[in-house]
């Protein structure tokens, strides 16, 4: 049987993403624990009080996320997680909408393996 012209020849499975899945699962879980309604509320409060632009608001979001991550896991694991986030670009990034000059964080942008997360879907 000649398989060179057969449309049903088996295709080779290509694995291009070599991230350690257990670490990704841990980071995703930690992110959901850290970024809550209260976290978003505090970011939105900073945006209004300090009249932040989108760049400043994103920086504030990331700094607060990093501080909470460090506090939650300790310095050794924190270093490992930030190296992973830097290498694979998995830092949670906020989605802002503009209300006449005031930004509101409405959720977190999707990554390759996680969907968009709206603030209404977050833990209280």
UniProtKB/Swiss-Prot annotation:
Keyword Membrane: no
Keywords on record: Host mitochondrion, Host-virus interaction, Inhibition of host innate immune response by virus, Inhibition of host interferon signaling pathway by virus, Inhibition of host IRF3 by virus, Inhibition of host IRF7 by virus, Inhibition of host RIG-I by virus, Inhibition of host RLR pathway by virus, Inhibition of host STAT2 by virus, Inhibition of host TBK1 by virus, Inhibition of host TLR pathway by virus, Interferon antiviral system evasion, Modulation of host cell apoptosis by virus, Viral immunoevasion
Keyword Flavoprotein appears in the UniProt entry: no
Disulphide-bonded residues: none
GO CC terms: host cell mitochondrion
GO BP field: symbiont-mediated perturbation of host apoptosis; symbiont-mediated suppression of host cytoplasmic pattern recognition receptor signaling pathway via inhibition of IRF3 activity; symbiont-mediated suppression of host cytoplasmic pattern recognition receptor signaling pathway via inhibition of IRF7 activity; symbiont-mediated suppression of host cytoplasmic pattern recognition receptor signaling pathway via inhibition of RIG-I activity; symbiont-mediated suppression of host cytoplasmic pattern recognition receptor signaling pathway via inhibition of TBK1 activity; symbiont-mediated suppression of host JAK-STAT cascade via inhibition of STAT2 activity; symbiont-mediated suppression of host toll-like receptor signaling pathway; symbiont-mediated suppression of host type I interferon-mediated signaling pathway
InterPro entries for the chain: RSV_NS2 (IPR004336)
Motif, DLNP: chain positions: 121-124
Pfam families: RSV_NS2
Subcellular location: Host mitochondrion
Free-text domain note: The DNLP motif has IFN suppressive functions like binding to host MAP1B.
Family as reported in the entry's similarity comment: Belongs to the pneumovirus non-structural protein 2 family.
Quaternary structure (record): Monomer (instable). Homomultimer. Heteromultimer with NS1. Interacts with host RIGI (via N-terminus); this interaction prevents host signaling pathway involved in interferon production. Interacts with host MAP1B/microtubule-associated protein 1B.
Function: Plays a major role in antagonizing the type I IFN-mediated antiviral response. Acts cooperatively with NS1 to repress activation and nuclear translocation of host IFN-regulatory factor IRF3. Interacts with the host cytoplasmic sensor of viral nucleic acids RIGI and prevents the interaction with its downstream partner MAVS. Together with NS2, participates in the proteasomal degradation of host STAT2, IRF3, IRF7, TBK1 and RIGI through a NS-degradasome involving CUL2 and Elongin-C. The degradasome requires an intact mitochondrial MAVS. Induces host SOCS1 expression.
Protein known as: Non-structural protein 2
Organism of derivation: Human respiratory syncytial virus
Organism phylogeny: Viruses, Riboviria, Orthornavirae, Negarnaviricota, Haploviricotina
Gene: 1B
């Amino acid at each position: 049987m000649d398989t060179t012209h057969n449309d049903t020849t088996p295709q080779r499975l290509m694995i291009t993403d070599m991230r350690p899945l257990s670490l990704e699962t841990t980071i995703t879980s930690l992110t959901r624990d850290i970024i809550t309604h209260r976290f978003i509320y505090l970011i939105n409060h900073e945006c209004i009080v300090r009249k932040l632009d989108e760049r400043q608001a994103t920086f504030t979001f990331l700094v607060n996320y990093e501080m909470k991550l460090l506090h939650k896991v300790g310095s050794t694991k924190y270093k490992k997680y930030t190296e992973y986030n830097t290498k694979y670009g998995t830092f949670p990034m906020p989605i802002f909408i503009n209300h006449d000059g005031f930004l509101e964080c409405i959720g977190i942008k999707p990554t390759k393996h996680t969907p968009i997360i709206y603030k209404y879907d977050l833990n209280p």
